[in-house]
Amino acid sequence: MGGNALSQLQSVRVDGVIDYPNDAWRFVADRRRPNELRLAAYRGDSLISAEGFTGTTAWSSTPGSAVCALSSRQGSSIQRDAEFFSPLLSGAPDGATLELVGSTRVDDAEAYDIHVTRGDGFQSDYLVDATSYLLLRKREVRAPRAGEAPIPIETAYYDYRPVAGVLYPFVTVEREQADGKLISVTVLKRVEPNSVDAAAMAPGCAAKS
């Protein structure tokens, strides 16, 4: 993965499945640089909801309803999810600060622990492989799902594959940091580079399958 590949990647369409212990749904996520997101959720072939970030405003919608603009507090997690690259690659956006805390072991790998504090005060720890520089873990305090209380969560990244010369993790596992209890497993089925135009990012519940 090089800087040239990163600069040429302008958008991605991701098709995947999120499995929870008692639930599962398919999603299609459209992303465009620098920070636009449209995420549609499905049960089977039925669209159940959509949400996203236009670059300035977070929004949500369900089939048959009007688009709802979210407050900065309500939409903060969506806005973070909309970042095309992590703060480690995007040059500390929006006043974020990065601090090298030290190093630790992740499985059998030596990893750098980089603490990120965003402009809004939200904090995360990124554990990066000291040899490959791939992201291995992310730790932060947030809600597992909408409407739930924030807890310490560790996200693990696996199965990196090249997408237009950029390595993407195709498997993501979230666990409670306190006891390792499984929260969710996300598996990407398809990642299409540079396939999303501006029209695809329109807020609302038009299906994008």
Model-derived features: where do they sit?
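Short amphipathic beta-strand/extended segments with alternating polar/hydrophobic composition
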Residues: 28-31, 49-55, 68-76, 128, ...
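Short, conserved active-site entrance elements at the starts or edges of catalytic domains
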Residues: 77-115, 135-137
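Gly/Pro-enriched, hydrophobic low-complexity segments
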Residues: 44-47, 107-205
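Acidic/charged, solvent-exposed loop-and-adjacent secondary-structure segments enriched in E/D, K/R, S/T
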Residues: 59-86
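Short acidic/polar alpha-helix capping motifs at helix-coil junctions
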Residues: 23, 63-65, 86-91, 120-124
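Short, solvent-exposed mixed-charge patches
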Residues: 208-209
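N-terminal mature ectodomain segment of secretory-pathway/periplasmic proteins
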Residues: 3-66, 97-100
